[in-house]
Amino acid sequence: MAKRLLPLTAEVSKACIRLLNLPLIEISILTLAKQGVRNFIFGVKGYVNYRSLHDHFESGVGFSAKYGINPRIHIKYQPNLDDCGSADSVRVNVEYYDVTDPVFAVQGDNIFDINLEDMLKFHEQKKAFLTIGLMRVSDVTGYGIAKVDSDTHISEFVEKPTLKEAPSNLANTGLYLFSPEVREVFKEDKVQEMIRKNKRLDFG
């Protein structure tokens, strides 16, 4: 439960909190649907979260009609399987739904403005396994700040650093683009050991 947003999240998923009378996640879905994304998987668990999202979106038919999205979007939901965090939720869903396309992962309460086609082109040009969206910020102390080399490779994130500690002013936006090979990476022994040891597999 998103305790920092109580009482707003007492009976509704954080992703369904309203901004300009729209659930936050509806704004995100519309941003992506306008760019041609048609298949969505909600990595949701817990009764309140599932009920909030399913009652509002169901399979996406009503959303598509509301915004004139044609062909319509298709929304699926995480199966009733335990996960160990946001990254592990991606693992669960790509396996369960046999996803073989690139995967764009974003938190449900994240509002963003991104050209997904440009991000995908960059991702493919770099032959990357994972591309993370970064944003320049004036105040680095409230974000995970990336250390990036001249070829745009990220070597580490420094979480909420002081100005002196910050390796750059590039903040993690919480937007992640995975190649289809993500399924094989999740099966690697070191990833499985990380899950067993830490009981968590989060994006951060």
Regions found by a protein language model. Name each.
Residues 29-30, 51, 58, 91, ...:
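Short alpha-helix within the catalytic core of nucleotide-sugar-dependent glycosyltransferases
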Residues 104, 111, 117-124, 138-140, ...:
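Catalytic-core segments of class I nucleotidyltransferases/pyrophosphorylases
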Residues 1-59:
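N-terminal glycine-rich phosphate-binding loop and ensuing alpha1 helix
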Residues 126-136:
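A short, conserved acidic/glycine-rich loop-to-beta-strand motif
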Residues 25, 93, 109, 123, ...:
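Residue-level signal for inorganic ion chemistry
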